Amino acid sequence: MKTIAIVGGGITGVTTAYALAKRGFTVTLFERHRYAAMETSFANGGQLSASNAEVWTHPSTIIKGLKWMLKSDAPLLVNPKPSWHKISWFAEFMASMTAYEKNTVETAKLAVAARQHLFAWAEAENIDFDLKKQGILHIYRDKKGFDHAGKVSEMLAKGGLPRHAVTPDEMKAIEPTLAGKYYGGYFTESDSTGDIHKFTNGLAQAVKRLGVRTLYDQNVTDIQSDSNQVTITVAHTDAPTSIHTFDSVVVCAGVASKQFASQLGDRVNIYPVKGYSITVNLNDAESQAGAPQVSLLDDETKLVTSRLGDDRFRVAGTAEFNGYNRDIRADRIKPLVDWVNQCFPKINTRSVVPWAGLRPMMPNMMPRVGRGKAANVFYNTGHGHLGWTLSAVTADMVAEVVSAQASAERATIISGSTNLARVST
């Protein structure tokens, strides 16, 4: 197993390419856009947030979804139109509720472990991605939300992540620009933020230096495996269809992973959960002074923030179950702008760039990392809202699995050669 294809050039695909190239594999990366990180990894919330490791498989999620179903500006919006994909996903989601605490603890462990890889890679490759190590402040507007956060903190502690409660006065000291009245907060000093798009593109340049063949504008339409060889079909708008063969493949294709897994005989029940963001351009001194330096997560509105350099302020959130729909809806963007005006009144929101992306979410909220049914098929996908946070550690994990598989194959070949030698003497 020497040649490996990676399908998908977002954060998980590029980090996987890096982890494999560093282990000496010959890697080819396929991406359907002209550049890396042009879909889900383009303009997310920016948080590297182990403190947001709580999985969504909690009864309150279903209750809120039903309550907000007819509210177009709700943080969680479910299109009531049924589909087998949506029904099966929610059925598995509810079945996963028994593992709520276990999966939250495990996600926290992964998120903490991911930091050392991501920061080390950024330093080794000299990648500037507006990294800010100033912690993340979770804010709560009522006692109910704050009390639930206390229970979540106990689970995060089991996963190796300490965070502490703060009073409204302490919240103001942590982030003086935050306006409004709050019940309390939780502050995680070890969390950080950064620009996922800048990091992914910086690492994409690094993998090229390591010898990875990066193929952009490549619309992969089919992947097949006979367990010995992988065949990838690529459609082109201005050229005939091309066929490529490799020893193995790692599927890192975001919401398209479900389709490719089906072609390969695997079931990866990812649902595309749309999220929105706005990037506020801080074009004047008052806006720059009035924007927060510390990253925030508002529990009531489910919005997160990141300060990206001096002149950009990112606000992101919402979860929309509406199929493979990438439309940017004005009624979903307006609550984000209104939130900025309410919480940070000194920011001028005249210049705002809206964006929407599809999070690849598994029903149990845990990424699919590891081998498929075929011995030469692997997955690193389904990270949901924590792709940026978890990408480095899952890339390292899947690279270890691939390396172990390759070592086992080499051992089999050596063993077979030894046996043949004994027979012939």
What are the functions of these language-model segments?
Residues 2-29:
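N-terminal Rossmann-like FAD-binding beta1-loop-alpha1 element of flavoenzymes
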Residues 22-42:
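Glycine-rich FAD pyrophosphate-binding loop
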